[in-house]
Amino acid sequence: MTRKLFFIGFMLFANLLFAQQTKKTWTLREIIDYAISNNLTIKRSTYNVQSGEINLLQSKMAMLPNLNFNGNYGINWGRTIDPTTNIFTENEIRNSNLGATSTWLLWNGFRLFYNLKQSDIELDAANEDLIKARNDVILNVITLYLNVVFNKELYNVAQLQLNTTQEQLQRTRKLADAGSVPLADVLNLDAQLATNEVNVIQQENALNLSLLQLKQALQLPASTPMDVELPQVDISNELLINKTADEIYDIATLSMPEIRAAELRKTSSQYAWRSAKGNLYPRISVNASYNTVYSDQRRQFYPDGNFQILTEEIGYVDGSNATVFRDVTVPTGQISVPSIGDQYRDNRGRSVGVNLQIPIFNGLSARSAMQRAAISRNVADISYLEISNTLRQAVETAYNNALAAGKTYASTERQVKARDEAYRMAKQRYSLGAVNFVDYQLAENNLFQSQSDLLRAKYDFIFRKKVLDFYQGLPLDF
């Protein structure tokens, strides 16, 4: 009883686990969206765009005046200068100072302006790189998706061939038992069945491998249950390509982000050269500063509102040298250290100035930087030509491949129709005993082979056509 309950519990757990691991059927749109959200190259390109945005903001802020605040507090002893009186003292001094400085660069050969333009263009180029990364991921995912669909349909064809052979073997055994066909036909069908089983295993392995490659592209664990939805594709109206390779290339030069990025970087290199050239020109800037100090050695008299009369010696009487005095009325009060707020207010200092810096000789650093920028500009021009040539070659190759794939599909489709009719006739004649088993089996094998070739030609053309659509900036969905 215990073993029975354990077995029932185990089966319930297994069913629950199986339900949790049910394969999810992915559509192409779901695959593309998931790949874009999780691809590491796209994430890296996104960070490059964010970095470009930061650089652009910094270039804008660099055109504004800077502002810095400084302050310190210190204790001095021994012979030192009191900062509030500028007199040497031997006493311990506790002092502090506050200050603010600002500098505004008015002109430096338009370097800041060119840096701003360069940062703006580099941000646009980074956005084009992000678009290219997304396009590359989409094209790669579609390639892997079509490979899965192709292998899935090949597996279905192999399974169908296996089922057909099994049914034929059962019928032939009955006929052999009745003496209508020789036993050799049964043995041949049994051998054919084993061959078909091997073919099913091979196609299943190819399907699993293509699914694994798709999972890896999506950053999914290999153990993730996965299936894909078969697209409903009618390519009969797409076999005719109504544009030439040159027309597709002209469209690609306007739609491909790598071309736009290369053009932008050409312009960016020109602004970089102009910015480097600005180092040869004078710099004009204005600056302003504010500072104040405090010292605990400063003394100040604070009257209390009362007065006292003091006797003051003012001279002598001629002849007798008698001292002459007078009464002086003076306010009374106390001498103490002014508060830190009063000292900061009383000791304020301000300055404004204009600076002019004319470069005369700086170890050729400015001229060398300009020469390096000129070389980078030439390299950007070459990179643009390389990318354009690579794109032209890719478009021409894709165009020829699509034409060949379309012709192959049309020929293979006619072949399937012919072999399907030949198989139908051979099957009828074999059931009537008009042809031998070898001829019948040959017709069947030829039909299934041509069906496999048609699937291969179909998905090869679909892929080639999608590549052409990609170069024209058309949607890649089905």
What are these regions (language model features)?
Residues 19-72, 78, 222, 229-270, ...:
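Bacterial Sec-pathway N-terminal export signals of envelope proteins
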Residues 99-101, 145, 249, 353-355, ...:
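Membrane-embedded beta-strand positions in outer-membrane beta-barrel channels/transporters
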Residues 1-10, 14-34, 204-250, 296, ...:
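Terminal intrinsically disordered/low-complexity segments used for targeting and assembly
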Residues 20-24, 70-104, 232-240, 274, ...:
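Small/polar, glycine/serine/threonine/aspartate-rich low-complexity segments that form flexible
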Residues 26, 136-251, 401, 405, ...:
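Periplasmic alpha-helical coiled-coil/stalk elements that build and connect Gram-negative outer-membrane
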Residues 47, 61, 198-220, 414-474:
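Short segments within alpha-helical structural elements
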Residues 43-47, 60, 92, 106-134, ...:
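Sec/SRP-type N-terminal targeting helices
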